[in-house]
């Protein structure tokens, strides 16, 4: 540490060894400080909702256009990086990208980790059997591990999934991801990883994650129809 920067110089700053540090006070204009405190205290979303109505329409539209362009560039850069990582495999890149978006922010990283760990060549051999796809997807996610489900909730179907995954795991020498990566707090039930994975099972089984089908969709309605996923019967009540 070579410099301590603060808003108010009210004490001597020292390192862990006791050495005094040079300090720099940066004065913040009162209106900026007030806006900062107001934004931090605001519980409504978005916090800036009081300010936006007072801005010129052209300013707001310009800001939104810039944000849209930045977001698209960010998404394109991520896809380019995935495409390089998969050595130009558009099918796998599409699957990973779709999975990441099923995480809806909170579980985006976990879903991407899961998709990167998903051997699509192995899954493809069992694609026509939705139960085997389900066992493979949930098993690779670590969600069939005993520690992830209370003993009283391990019903016959769950145990059957576990057994099937053990078979597939041995057959393809698989290693599941760390289930601790999944987040459940402050999520609505429909956004739980189990539900989103069950939807991925249905989409994959019905070949609606195929890159060729998605890019050949002619209309927004057709694309929405392809991505309109339901869950397998078991997960409708779990």
Give, region by region, the residue ranges found by the protein language model.
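Hydrophobic, aromatic-lined core segments that form the binding pocket/scaffold
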Residues: 67-238
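Internal, well-ordered alpha/beta segment that forms a basic, Gly-enriched binding/recognition surface
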Residues: 4-123
């Amino acid at each position: 540490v070579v410099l301590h920067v603060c808003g108010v110089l009210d004490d001597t700053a020292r390192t862990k060894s006791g050495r005094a540090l040079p300090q720099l006070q940066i004065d913040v204009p009162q209106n900026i400080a007030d806006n900062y405190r107001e934004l931090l205290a605001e519980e409504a979303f978005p916090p800036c909702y009081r300010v936006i109505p007072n801005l010129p329409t052209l300013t707001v539209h310009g800001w939104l256009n810039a944000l849209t362009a930045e977001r698209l560039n960010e998404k394109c850069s991520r896809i380019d990086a995935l495409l390089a990582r998969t050595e130009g495999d558009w099918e796998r890149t599409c699957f990973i990208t779709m999975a990441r978006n099923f995480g809806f922010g909170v579980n985006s990283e976990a879903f991407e980790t899961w998709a990167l760990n998903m051997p699509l060549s192995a899954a493809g051999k069992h694609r026509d059997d939705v139960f085997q796809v389900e066992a493979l997807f949930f098993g690779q996610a670590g969600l069939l591990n005993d520690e992830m489900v209370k003993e009283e909730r391990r019903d016959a179907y769950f145990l059957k999934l576990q057994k099937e995954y053990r078979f597939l795991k041995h057959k393809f020498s698989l290693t599941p991801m760390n289930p601790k990566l999944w987040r459940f707090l402050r999520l609505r039930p429909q956004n739980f990883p189990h539900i989103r994975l069950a939807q991925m099972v249905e989409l994959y089984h019905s070949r609606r994650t195929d890159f060729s089908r998605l890019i050949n969709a002619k209309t927004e309605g057709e694309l929405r129809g392809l991505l309109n996923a339901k869950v397998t019967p078991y997960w409708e009540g779990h």
